[in-house]
Amino acid sequence: MKFYSNGKILITGEYFVLNGALSLAVPTVYGQYLEISDNDSNIINWTSYNKNKQIWFKCELDKDSLKVKYSSSKEVSEIIKELISFIREKESNFLKSNGSIINTELTFDKDWGLGSSSTLINNLSKFSGVNPYELNTKFFNGSGYDIACADSSSSLLYRLNDNKKEIKQINFNPSFRDKLHFIYLNKKQNSLDEIKSFREKINSKIGITEISDITKRIILCKDQLEFNSLIKEHENIVSKLTSKEKVKDKLFNDFDGEIKSLGAWGGDFILASALDKNPTDYFKSKGFNTVLNYNELALV
């Protein structure tokens, strides 16, 4: 059996989606495959491949006890053991055949922060029947927007309302999308650490109304100058409330247009809205060589 889940990009609502802000999320054209087959080895053979079809992780677990017989990474194998154990609490026969071969394959660079964990969780959920949001909450305590993107065929609005998930698929495909680019900052952020830090520092009610209002205005936006004004306003709010420096001020203060951080600030991808020419050469001159136009990354 083979399963696939989309990666994700959070356009608005980073951090504040955790506390109930209405947020705009976009599934990506990249994702992760999970293929499972049985054998007679009494072993769970797990192999993970990167986008170049090279092995980046491998382990062997006893199918019953989940004792690690071999692992190329103790940290990763412990996470996999915990995932399997938790799923077995809900579905006792999960991976209890005579043995299993499990292969995962990313179609994006695993350092890009597009959801290597959420796509894995969603794929395991499809196979096991266990609720993916329950798995996600147990292991990552995130908002769940990434799980919503995993099976979505379009952009979506996402909100947590009294811990209930409100998801609405929308068509976010702005007419000026040829002026929008995603740039990788050559650094992967630790989502778990960022979530923990935010929850400890920020009052649960602060910023929700303002961020939600910007999201509503962005999805209706027809004009690039208005869009730029809105993402600038979004950056100002997040910067003020989290005491984090805006990425444009820090790295790109001479950029002709506006820039918005996506997800945890300081790494992964940013969104650039260029007023004039294609900004690829500009970002490459600054040392950032991964520049994708909107349609190259967003599933539209």
Task: Please tell me what each predicted stretch does.
Residues D111-Y133:
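DPxDG-like acidic metal-binding loop motif
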Residues L106-K110:
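Acidic, glycine-rich active-site loops and adjacent beta-strand->loop/helix elements
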Residues F3-N6, L10, V17, A25-V26, ...:
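C-terminal nucleotide
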